[in-house]
Amino acid sequence: MNKADKNSLKRSKEITNDYFLFLDQHISDVISGNVDHFLEINQIADKLSLSHKHLTDTIQKETGNHPCHYYDLKIIDQAKNMLSNSDKSVSEIARTLTYDPSNFSKFFKKFVGQTPGLFRKESKI
């Protein structure tokens, strides 16, 4: 592997790491109320000083999945945590995560395979 290939590989890993760190901070900011909405992937790319295509291609090459996949999974992880460890209603959690409650339930069920209410009930057992 030549030096240019090594540098490209190193840069790809750096972009991927920066993306995941940004997602963690951004999702935390939304949950805490410091930010009132989730950014789109093109907006995240802009914040990372990348084109949308470069970010998408890099994440897909490094991980095998589209950046949206990880964005959604990280939101689902936060939702699961809130459902398991808080007394907030499903509607409150949905609104905290900037979702309409009915859309949130569909989104959650798509990834988890059960409704937020059922997940909460089973996680308390």
Residue ranges and their predicted role:
Residues 42-70, 94-118:
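Basic/polar phosphate-binding segments, predominantly the helix-turn-helix DNA-binding elements
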Residues 1-12, 56:
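Basic, amphipathic alpha-helix used for nucleic-acid engagement in HTH/winged-helix/SANT-Myb modules
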Residues 10-48, 69-87:
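A short, Lys/Arg-enriched amphipathic alpha-helix from helix-turn-helix/homeodomain DNA-binding modules
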Residues 2, 49-53, 78:
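Short C-terminal domain-edge/linker segments immediately following a structured domain
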Residues 62-99, 122-125:
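Terminal helix-turn-helix DNA-binding modules in bacterial transcription factors
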